[in-house]
């Protein structure tokens, strides 16, 4: 894996998934050079989708993409059985890869993680992207566990690393050849400078062209040019997490007239003071017309 993979929002309209809006967003992203799209992850509000909605979104995204870029379907769960079933479904409908978050809330030990991911890996043939985000799961995949999984299962090929500890990223890259993708927009360049391959991005939903340019410069070793774009987008990157993701990105998309719609409870609308900060940042970047 290499490049920019937006973690796409799930647009809603009148309480249901807005599939036409989803199609428009996907076309916009592909036209602006992304390497793939990642539906039903954190940004896609997977915790508040019903199982049928979750599967339908994956199916529709595969259909809308129609082979133009990769589809990396979010299929993780804190239930190994559910993760396995979602992953098998994603493979059956044509997803290119699956994204598996570490089990949250039940906080398994490292041995439990090995068995959890191993069960899913043995049940499918498509490549698996591990997803480490300790700030949400209260659980870190240790580098030795990542190495074990990469060595043991041929279809575990990449990790979305959202642990902001660059020491951990360095250790992962030092001990195994797994593809490391940043799970934090603002750490994309630092991680790529260590040998990372790109990013699963939030900000790319609204600024895909610029973010793709930044990553392509980094891939070519042109870090001076990449840094210019990084610092240009940095204030907006930080605002994407001024409240819980995906509240800021969906708010920004609504401001820009992009299909996004409401959030599902328990997520709710952004505080007015933060909306003003977001609006100012979008104006500064010339994104608001």
Swiss-Prot record:
Subcellular location: Cytoplasm
GO molecular function annotations of the record: 2-dehydro-3-deoxy-phosphogluconate aldolase activity; 4-hydroxy-tetrahydrodipicolinate synthase activity
Enzyme Commission (EC) number: 4.3.3.7
Catalytic reaction list: L-aspartate 4-semialdehyde + pyruvate = (2S,4S)-4-hydroxy-2,3,4,5-tetrahydrodipicolinate + H2O + H(+)
UniProt organism field: Methanococcus vannielii (strain ATCC 35089 / DSM 1224 / JCM 13029 / OCM 148 / SB)
Role this protein plays: Catalyzes the condensation of (S)-aspartate-beta-semialdehyde [(S)-ASA] and pyruvate to 4-hydroxy-tetrahydrodipicolinate (HTPA).
Active site location: 131 (proton donor/acceptor), 160 (schiff-base intermediate with substrate)
Gene symbol of the encoding locus: dapA
Site (Part of a proton relay during catalysis): 42, 105
Protein name: 4-hydroxy-tetrahydrodipicolinate synthase
